[in-house]
Amino acid sequence: SAASDVYKRQNLFYYAQFLVMDYPNEIYELCANYIREQCAQATDRRLYKKVCKDLLQLIKWKGNATAKLLVDEFKATYPRRSALLDELQKVERKL
């Protein structure tokens, strides 16, 4: 449900900020799985922006390589989602 998704994101990103320094790869992987799931379910620009906001957080945590993999993966998987591709370009500028 949408409510449990919000809760899951809040928990994941809240705890990740404390753990990312000591366990970067584990945190990047958890975040990547969550972002992947969200992107698969996203249907409009508002939701694509949320996906990209999470990608930008990953970059802030030095997860550039993971963010780049996800951006490339989403571009290949969803070539017809023009609004998503548009939002992903904004993330790419920060990589």
Task: Say what each PLM segment does.
Residues K8-K60:
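Structured C-terminal portions of repeat-based eukaryotic scaffold domains
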Residues I35, T43, K49-L95:
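C-terminal non-catalytic interaction modules
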